[in-house]
């Protein structure tokens, strides 16, 4: 059991080399983390720790955990259609050796024996990726920009697990012409055991340069 929280301060692009600095904090079993690019710009800040995070009790649990099929007609997400306090449609996915291999060879490259081979468990980033997947399961989102997350990991995900994910909308707002949505995610296995809970912030409508200039002056 462990947790992570992080915020993206500056964009990173393919080819960037990031230095990761982890500093143990005074509190037990927690570390502050920074990811810094070659120009010494801090791009990501966060904390990680063991056990349960202080904020883990703040999550809103979804009650709509019956998954719906892909291919349903999706509407556009707007500030008006975000439906604060409503559960999104749930989705399911099987964690297989093939899924693990694809993820660790194409998205989060690693040769850590925990996450590769014939009997891997899911990489924590695979779990974190569920938030954006659930948003796109419910809405037609051409592009988005993930800005912040809190993740409470509760169980590992071994091969053969069927994962069911659901989300509950916490808020939607505009900031500097960008349109944000904030939602909580609950992941469970086929036996109804909790795998993880997430709180996710993302820009679902990225402002154009003209829109930002109009707001910022």
Segments predicted by a language model, with ranges:
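Hot-dog-fold acyl-thioester-processing enzymes
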Residues: 1-2, 49-148, 207-217
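HotDog/MaoC-like acyl-thioester-processing domains
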Residues: 3, 8, 12-81, 157-217
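Long amphipathic N-terminal alpha/beta scaffold segment
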Residues: 145, 156-157
């Amino acid at each position: 059991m462990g947790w992570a929280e992080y915020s993206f301060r500056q964009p990173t692009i393919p080819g960037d080399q990031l230095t990761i600095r982890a500093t143990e904090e005074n509190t037990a079993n927690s570390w502050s983390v920074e990811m810094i690019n070659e120009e010494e710009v801090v791009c990501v800040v966060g904390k990680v720790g063991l056990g349960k995070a202080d904020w883990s009790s703040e999550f809103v649990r979804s009650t709509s955990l019956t998954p719906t099929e892909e291919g349903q007609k999706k509407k556009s997400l707007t500030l008006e259609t975000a439906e604060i306090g409503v559960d999104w449609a749930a989705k399911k996915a099987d964690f297989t050796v093939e899924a693990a291999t694809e993820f660790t060879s194409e998205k989060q490259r690693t040769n850590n024996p925990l996450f590769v081979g014939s009997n891997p468990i899911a990489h924590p980033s695979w779990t974190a990726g569920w938030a954006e997947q659930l948003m796109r399961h419910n809405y037609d989102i051409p592009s988005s920009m993930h800005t912040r997350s809190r993740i409470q990991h509760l169980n590992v995900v071994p091969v053969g697990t069927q994962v069911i994910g659901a989300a509950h909308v916490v808020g939607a707002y505009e900031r500097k012409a960008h349109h944000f949505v904030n939602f909580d995610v609950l992941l469970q296995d086929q036996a109804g055991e909790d795998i993880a809970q997430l709180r996710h912030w993302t820009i679902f409508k990225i402002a154009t340069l003209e829109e930002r200039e109009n707001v910022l002056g």
